[in-house]
A protein has these predicted regions:
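All-alpha prenyltransferase/terpene-synthase fold signal
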Residues: 1-158
Length: 158
């Protein structure tokens, strides 16, 4: 929402029509959503040295991000029970704080790569919608930079 609002306000401030400002809002909304999805992917499947922060923090905090939601949808009933126990544990309890080995054991049998793949596909779809929202606008360096930003968001490693 923040990306969309700032994109729309920027366009309006520059004198864009309501229609063009709305297109920029759509661009920003989709870009922001994709950025968050990629951030969720990196927390699950990134390289800690490249990302520059500890991985698995969303999991530790009990945040159900898109890769985990997909995994839950595809999981067996028993797997969902294990997962639910972790995510409903008191945030301050030791049941929520897992070291890397314990996380691997909890996630054993889940299709983590499938969740990452699904999330990546959703991020790609958001970015295609973002770029499409700008279609037909006169080409200029600023629009070219926005289109490049969409590509960066999808392929970023940090």
């Amino acid at each position: 929402v923040l990306y969309g609002a700032s994109s729309r306000l920027g366009a309006a401030y520059a004198g864009a029509s309501d229609d063009v400002a709305l297109r920029f809002q759509i661009f920003g909304d989709q870009l922001g959503l994709a950025f968050q999805i990629v951030d969720d992917i990196l927390d699950v499947d990134g390289d800690e040295e490249v990302v520059g922060k500890s991985l698995g923090t969303d999991f530790d905090k009990g945040k159900l991000t898109l890769p985990f939601l997909w995994m839950l949808r595809e999981a067996s009933a028993g797997q969902r029970v294990r997962f639910r126990e972790h995510f409903t544990a008191d945030k301050a309890s030791d049941a929520r704080r897992l070291d890397a080995a314990a996380q691997r054991r909890l996630l054993e049998g889940f299709d983590l790569k499938g969740g990452v793949r699904y999330a990546h596909e959703r991020a790609d779809a958001c970015l295609r919608a973002a770029v499409e929202s700008l279609a037909g606008l006169p080409s200029n360096p600023a629009l070219d930079a926005l289109r490049s930003m969409a590509d960066y968001v999808l392929h970023r490693q940090r």
